[in-house]
Amino acid sequence: CKETFDIDADLVAKATEQADRAQETFENQLQLRGRQVLENVHEDGGYAVVIASRPYHNDPLVNHGLPKLFSERGIPVLTPDAVPGVCNVDLSNSRIDIVNNYHARMLSCAVIVASTPELELVQMGSFGCGHDAYLTDEIARMMGEMGSKVPMMIKLDESDVAGPMGIRVRSFIESVNRRRAEERAEGARVHAVHPLDDPY
């Protein structure tokens, strides 16, 4: 560092330590906020939506305002990192050999959403990403085997036409509301949640 950037090594070490602390603080606050959202929707009898996606989908120009389509209707939106326990899910019964953290978080969210009454799952994909093809199938399989929830998969492209996406979101919300109403009518908050068996 000193030779290349004229920065002392001890200064770099201190800066790195501060950055690690800041990152840890941010992650703790994000998890805390996620727990608060879950508590609020539980008390209100509602639900939140977890949008499982890749980092570039945080850009409104890429996601075309999808999170806002839920929040405008009073449905809170969580990112995978804000879902309590997302780093502690046992994925040994997944059919996929997990090769990166993004895949792990999406699959972990599927397991958590399937077993949490106050959560629903939306997966965003772009540009026909090859990995998303089998991730989508595995997310649907895992959630289907564990319970009655069906995730929404929405493929985004370069078009900014909002109409079709709005229709998809409204249809998804209506399906979720109908399923939840049927479950309440049966006297249960959710259908039975089954453990994920060994797929082989």
Locate each region found by the language model:
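An N-terminal assembly and electron-transfer interface module characteristic of large anaerobic redox
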Residues: 1-200
